[in-house]
Amino acid sequence: MSDHLFLDTRDVTITGRNVIGRCVPYNETSYLVPSPKGERIRRQAFAESIAQRGTNVFLNLEHDETRTVAKAVRWDDDDDGLVGEFHLRSGELQDRTLEELADGWWPYMSVAFRPLRETRGGDGAVEVVTAKLAHVALVKCPAYDGAEVLAVRNASPTSLLEGLGPRPDIDLTPLPRFW
């Protein structure tokens, strides 16, 4: 009898320095947690934390804060999960991380968080209702299967300008000379 291991491989196209990924899927039960009945994150569990911290959330490798590679530039809290976009600056570690992303070494994401409010689901699983997001990590083995790198691309002009607020009306008419 032979055992076969089938791996799902994905092709992540590298076109820039922004990593986009589903940091945590909603309503997916993980059993790679201390609770024997599992744990799942409810929709918008991180909404308050994201509102407070915004782009001051960092991306590191394997939850090692000494290997921080990127900073959040945008969040999308959709029905499937919390999607984050992180910008990698130039640097030896960041450049190597981009190469490793292209080679499939970092296919998944994981969140470090502190639960603020939890409840129990009908199946006994811990349901995280509200949590404080500490950081996000690129990992090889996620706690939640749906937490995955979705793309690596160039920053969109709108995502770079989102945090600046509305554009002010400025009169660019030349001023008359008085001398």
Question: What is the predicted function of each stretch?
Answer:
Residues 22-23, 61-63, 86, 140:
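Pocket-edge structural micro-motifs
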Residues 8-18, 73-167:
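Residue microenvironments linked to proteolytic maturation
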